């Protein structure tokens, strides 16, 4: 008998979704099923794989519960929430600001490009920065095979046997990052550095003063970066930061895309834009929006606005509706304050206390250097540990005095670590918050009691960079890098996708930045849903 089309039973990898199978720039023609199969087969049976299975089962349960609640909504309920949604959409529309011009610049495969610049023999060959344990990034030649950042090197080698590995060199990347920032400063002295390899610039004034179009500034800036560094970058121009970020990815590498400051142009642009393209919507939120509400594009956020208002808190519903309208942050960051600063390191799992204390000392020194560079001192110190079984634990202490020296940070961090020993961990992180002079640092941000009480019952604040609104409403927070998880939550599952080894993505590894990789996605839920959603712990 002829065998029929494969099902999930004989092709289990088809239902296995990880960050490694999500396309990045340069991966448009990748055989996605092959990548899924390789990742599935090489991770099957590992602790990471078991963690993934728990995550999938958890989200499936939540999706099933939400579907039941959707089915129980009456026509009267929907009519009520539609009125709520319509009123809020009108209010959001009234806030639309088309007066600013934002440019997002993103270096092309930054770490890999820097290494190729240092060693021209790598040009045209598939290469990745990292090791057999974990990759930081991959060049565009390697991406054609499905190799990407955050992927274990041994999986990458399986996908691309010719792959060349180059060890990381952050001093080198920081040097070139500083060169790019000199160029950015010519166009906007108050630019927002999202990470080592990206930035947001308000080019409104420079366009007005020089009487030039935004595309000319984008072209000139990109040429300036190349002249200064020998590296290429891509740019996106739009009326707000959220859309500028999306636009910078359209013509990668070494290209640019300009979205006019026109309402109709914006609405047309977002009408067919996949929701996953939006900063703040990661894998889990995508699954929920698609699986429960049938929302695949930004435009459908408005079409399903009654359900959004019924099931999500006002801040989350506002974010989703804003996405449907193509709205985002347009204000200048000068008046905003940094709320936290952190450092973390990932390594092969170990219970060696001497090594753990050495890692802690290194983190304290890096954290202190960053704080003193910005003139910061803080009262709350948080320790984050990721165990060998991918469980994320956090412990925090609020001190009587403000601290900033590496000695003070290390002294209190050791006490927090000592309480957890003996333990085998693969990640250590330190975070300092509640800074001196920050009147609101101890208060919760109403937009940040966010996105999933699906995932955790604790209050989780958004990951803060030196400019805390880099990703606009970044409702999807990465538990791997978010040091602000409520210290009472000690059994959170890890929602990123690492194996053993270093996890180093194209982000500033020394400071707390808004990262776009998959993480815990916290969703504030309305009272309608909360009885059916419970936080979980191991």
Stretches found by the model and what they are:
Residues 177-186, 190-228, 232:
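Hydrophobic alpha-helical hairpins/lids featuring a short glycine-rich hinge
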Residues 1-196, 200, 324, 505, ...:
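Residues that scaffold, gate, or flank divalent-cation-dependent active/transport sites
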Residues 114-117, 138-141, 243-251, 291, ...:
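Short acidic, glycine/serine/threonine-rich loops at helix termini
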Residues 194-198, 238-241, 376-380, 425-427:
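Short Gly/Ser/Thr- and Asp/Glu-enriched loop/turn motifs at secondary-structure junctions
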Residues 213-277:
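Long, highly charged, low-complexity intrinsically disordered interaction regions
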Residues 35-38, 45, 268, 277, ...:
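DNA-contacting surface of Y-family translesion DNA polymerases
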Residues 87-91, 112-115, 221, 367-370, ...:
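Eukaryotic intrinsically disordered and solvent-exposed regulatory patches
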Residues 106, 146, 156, 197, ...:
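A residue-level signal for conserved active-site and pocket-lining positions in enzyme catalytic cores
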């Amino acid at each position: 008998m002829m065998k029929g089309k494969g099902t999930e039973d004989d092709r289990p990898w088809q239902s296995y979704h990880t960050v490694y199978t999500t396309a990045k720039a340069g991966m448009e023609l990748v055989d996605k099923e092959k990548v899924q199969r390789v990742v599935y087969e090489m991770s099957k049976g590992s602790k990471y794989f078991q963690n993934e299975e728990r995550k999938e089962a958890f989200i499936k349960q939540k999706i099933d519960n939400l579907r039941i609640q959707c089915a129980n909504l009456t026509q009267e309920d929907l009519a009520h929430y539609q009125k709520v949604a319509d009123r809020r959409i009108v209010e959001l529309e009234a806030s639309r600001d088309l007066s600013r011009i934002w440019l997002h610049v993103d270096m092309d495969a930054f770490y890999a490009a820097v290494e190729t610049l240092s060693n021209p023999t790598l040009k045209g060959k598939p290469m990745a920065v990292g090791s057999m344990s974990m990759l930081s990034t991959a060049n565009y030649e390697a991406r054609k095979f499905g190799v990407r950042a955050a992927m274990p090197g041994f999986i990458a080698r399986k996908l691309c046997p010719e792959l060349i590995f180059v060890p990381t060199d952050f001093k080198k990347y920081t040097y070139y990052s500083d060169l790019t920032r000199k160029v950015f400063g010519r166009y906007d002295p108050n630019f927002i550095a999202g990470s080592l390899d990206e930035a947001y610039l308000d080019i409104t004034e420079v366009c007005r003063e020089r009487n030039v179009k935004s595309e000319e500034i984008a072209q000139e800036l990109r040429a300036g970066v190349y002249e200064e560094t020998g590296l290429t970058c891509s740019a996106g121009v739009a009326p707000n930061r959220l859309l500028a970020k999306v636009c910078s990815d359209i013509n990668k590498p070494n290209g640019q895309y300009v979205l006019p400051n026109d309402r109709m142009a914006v609405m047309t642009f977002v009408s067919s834009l996949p929701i996953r393209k939006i900063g703040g919507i990661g894998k889990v939120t995508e699954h929920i929006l698609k699986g429960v509400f049938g929302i695949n594009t930004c435009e459908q956020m408005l079409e399903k606005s009654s359900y959004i208002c019924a099931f999500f808190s006002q801040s989350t519903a506002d974010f989703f509706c804003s996405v449907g309208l193509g709205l985002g942050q347009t204000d200048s960051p000068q008046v905003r304050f940094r709320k936290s600063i952190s450092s973390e390191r990932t390594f092969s799992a170990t219970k060696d206390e001497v090594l753990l204390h050495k890692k802690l000392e290194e983190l304290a020194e890096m954290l202190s250097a960053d704080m003193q560079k910005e003139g910061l001192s803080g009262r709350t110190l948080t320790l984050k540990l990721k165990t060998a079984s991918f469980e994320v634990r956090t412990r925090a202490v609020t001190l009587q005095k403000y601290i900033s020296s590496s000695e003070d940070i290390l002294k209190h961090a050791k006490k927090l670590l000592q309480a957890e020993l003996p333990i085998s961990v693969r990640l250590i992180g330190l975070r300092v918050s509640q800074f001196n002079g920050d009147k609101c640092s101890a208060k919760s941000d109403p937009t940040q009691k966010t996105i999933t009480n699906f995932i955790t019952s604790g209050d989780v604040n958004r990951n803060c960079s030196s400019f805390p609104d880099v990703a606009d409403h970044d409702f999807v927070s990465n538990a791997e890098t978010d040091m602000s998880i409520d210290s009472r939550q000690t059994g959170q599952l890890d929602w990123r996708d690492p194996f053993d080894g270093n996890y180093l993505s194209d982000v500033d590894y020394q400071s707390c930045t808004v990262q776009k990789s998959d993480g815990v996605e916290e969703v504030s839920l309305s009272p309608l849903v909360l009885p059916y959603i419970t936080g979980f712990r191991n």
